């Protein structure tokens, strides 16, 4: 493992720009400013709502080189400066020895930021190739191996919180995947105890939309590392759910936000899980049942305007 503390170098000299370049730059800067404000607000709200980071925490920011983890690191570095509490950050990348992985990209970027970081080198690629038949999705095994390595190294580093870059859309996709394929009403929690019981995992981007993160990543110029270096086939089930949600978001603006709100407003008494609600001891004298029999009343639905997905491509940036 390579462990480095670095300082930020001098800023590179500016270049001469034409008037058209200046106009485009001004527009992008305004757009970036709006996105920055929005993402910082949502990240800060998620951290506060779930008490993700506390005084004296050492946060391992898991950095893959993708848009989500770059954005998460950027948000947390800002929070570190602005928050009323003191906490430290160490950015960690797991180099899994995938063919063609650009080993210089992340160290160069992190040295430029002046953030403490560690590069953990483990050849999980060879293990995955040996265990998974050619042409099959390797993501599941790769993810389990990666988690185990990160968790064990977190203990060695004295880390108190492990930050992952999953966002709102990941959480909704996981909800539908579990419903469709596992028969479970289960999503991806913003905060949890890790598999080994020794770490607390947090997802600071839990309230952030993937499209906002993607736009922010482009405008910020992050040096993105592609996630298909291993040659694995994309998870078809997740891809189908992602496409379904994207179509809904275009046809029915606001539906994604409403569905995510549902994750935060669960009514166990109006589901069918005896383990989540004590139906056995329910009797007519119990008047504390949430919402009572209003479930039989007609729902008051807010009408939405259907949009032709072919005619009106939409990118929403609030």
From Swiss-Prot:
GO CC aspect terms: cytoplasm
Classification via CDD domains: TtcA-like
Region of interest (Disordered), residue spans: 1-29
Biased composition (Polar residues): 16-27
Cell location: Cytoplasm
Cofactor: Mg(2+); [4Fe-4S] cluster
Cofactor: binding details: Binds 1 [4Fe-4S] cluster per subunit. The cluster is chelated by three Cys residues, the fourth Fe has a free coordination site that may bind a sulfur atom transferred from the persulfide of IscS.
Keywords in alphabetical order: 4Fe-4S, ATP-binding, Cytoplasm, Iron, Iron-sulfur, Magnesium, Metal-binding, Nucleotide-binding, RNA-binding, Transferase, tRNA processing, tRNA-binding
Alphabetical list of InterPro entries matching this protein: Rossmann-like_a/b/a_fold, TilS/TtcA_N, tRNA_Cyd_32_2_STrfase
This protein's name: tRNA-cytidine(32) 2-sulfurtransferase
């Amino acid at each position: 493992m390579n462990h480095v503390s670095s300082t930020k170098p001098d800023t590179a000299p500016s270049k001469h720009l034409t008037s058209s370049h200046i106009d485009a730059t001004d527009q992008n800067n305004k757009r970036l400013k709006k996105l920055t404000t929005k993402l910082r607000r949502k990240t800060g709200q998620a951290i506060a709502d779930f008490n993700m980071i506390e005084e004296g925490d050492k946060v391992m920011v898991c950095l893959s080189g993708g848009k989500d983890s770059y954005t998460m690191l950027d948000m947390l570095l800002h929070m570190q400066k602005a928050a009323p509490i003191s906490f430290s950050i160490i950015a960690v990348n797991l180099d899994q020895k995938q063919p063609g992985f650009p080993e210089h990209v992340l160290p160069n970027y992190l040295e430029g930021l002046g953030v403490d970081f560690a590069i953990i080198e483990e050849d999980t690629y060879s293990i995955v190739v040996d265990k998974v038949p050619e042409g099959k999705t390797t993501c599941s095994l790769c993810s389990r191996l990666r988690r185990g390595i990160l968790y064990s190294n977190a203990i060695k580093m004295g880390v108190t919180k492990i930050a992952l870059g999953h966002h709102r859309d990941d959480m909704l996709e996981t909800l539908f995947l579990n419903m469709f394929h596992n028969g479970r009403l289960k999503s991806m929690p913003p905060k949890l105890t890790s598999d080994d019981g020794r770490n607390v995992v947090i997802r600071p981007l839990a309230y952030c939309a993937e499209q906002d993160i993607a736009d922010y990543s482009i405008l910020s110029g992050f040096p993105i590392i592609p996630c298909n270096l291993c040659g694995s086939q994309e998870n078809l089930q997740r891809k189908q759910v992602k496409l379904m949600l994207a179509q809904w978001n275009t046809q029915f603006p606001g539906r994604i936000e409403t569905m995510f709100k549902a994750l935060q407003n669960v009514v166990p008494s109006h589901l069918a899980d005896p383990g989540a609600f004590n139906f056995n001891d329910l009797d007519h004298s119990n008047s504390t049942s949430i919402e009572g029999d209003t479930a039989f009343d007609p729902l008051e639905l807010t009408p939405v305007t259907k949009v032709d997905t072919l005619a009106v491509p939409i990118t929403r940036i609030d």
